[in-house]
Amino acid sequence: MKNTIQTFKNAKYEGKKLSMLTAYDYSIAKIMDECDINGILIGDSLGMVIKGEENTLSVTIDEIIYHTKAVKNGVKNALIVSDMPFLSYHVSIEDAVKNAGRLIKEGGAHAVKLEGGSNVIKQIESIVNAQIPVMGHLGLTPQSVNSFGGFKVQGNTSETARQLIEDAKLIEKAGAFSIVLEGVPTKIAEMVTNSISIPTIGIGAGINCDGQILVYQDMLGMFGDFVPKFVKQYANIGDIMKDSIKNYILEVNTGAFPQEKHSFSINESELEKLY
């Protein structure tokens, strides 16, 4: 079934949970789509898990477009949402609409996601008015890592929790079709979810959100050096990959690979002409 922003909105009313994962290339996106994932996010998290940076701030709009194109080619049914990276919507309303439009027109995304609350309402309204669906993002917003002093849980005081709820209402009023809640206490995420009519997608925000999203490298266990508290690893793909690569190297070194079944032949009569 084709997933649209209406699918997301209906899911909340029907009590159906929404599943999302990040993806950055054709092959992974194709596998996810074949598993009937509801939505795929081309996240600026690619700065960390693809480029190896310590945060997301260096990611450019052109990089998001590049990876969105790749994901688009592997997807038939999932809703494709592209992140608007740092400074792609902060400088002016015109920049925000232009860059959101590029993600749709050049990248092939179905919607865009941007971080922030009351400070980005005008951007959300303008992008929505340009007929571009918007997903909001509240709580631990990685583009604000320097302001937060690191990747820390948000909304863990009555004052900040109240602000989260108010921001969620403002984002809904501005026309967003859903909101990501990241790094928020479970009870507060539940309060936010119950205060708005659009779905919330949680990442480190507990069980009561309308859906969940994870970075696929985290949930597949590709990196063993650090596992965020909110991540459940459904596999240890990193270990499987290492074992496979080691076996490949061993077989190349010992001459066990390639075998005859992996090789091509030439007609003997043609071969004789070369001698």
Curated annotation (Swiss-Prot):
The keyword Magnesium applies. Mg(2+) binds at D44, D83, E115. CDD domains: KPHMT-like. GO terms for molecular function: 3-methyl-2-oxobutanoate hydroxymethyltransferase activity; magnesium ion binding. The keyword Magnesium applies. GO terms for biological process: pantothenate biosynthetic process. It comes from Clostridioides difficile (strain 630) (Peptoclostridium difficile). Belongs to the PanB family. Pathway: Cofactor biosynthesis; (R)-pantothenate biosynthesis; (R)-pantoate from 3-methyl-2-oxobutanoate: step 1/2. Its EC number is 2.1.2.11. This is 3-methyl-2-oxobutanoate hydroxymethyltransferase. Homodecamer; pentamer of dimers. It holds the Pfam family Pantoate_transf. Binds 1 Mg(2+) ion per subunit. It catalyses: 3-methyl-2-oxobutanoate + (6R)-5,10-methylene-5,6,7,8-tetrahydrofolate + H2O = 2-dehydropantoate + (6S)-5,6,7,8-tetrahydrofolate. It comes from the Bacteria. It is found in: Cytoplasm. HAMAP family: PanB. 3-methyl-2-oxobutanoate binds at D44, S45, D83, K113. The active site is at E182. GO terms for cellular component: cytoplasm. Catalyzes the reversible reaction in which hydroxymethyl group from 5,10-methylenetetrahydrofolate is transferred onto alpha-ketoisovalerate to form ketopantoate. It is an enzyme of class 2 (transferase).
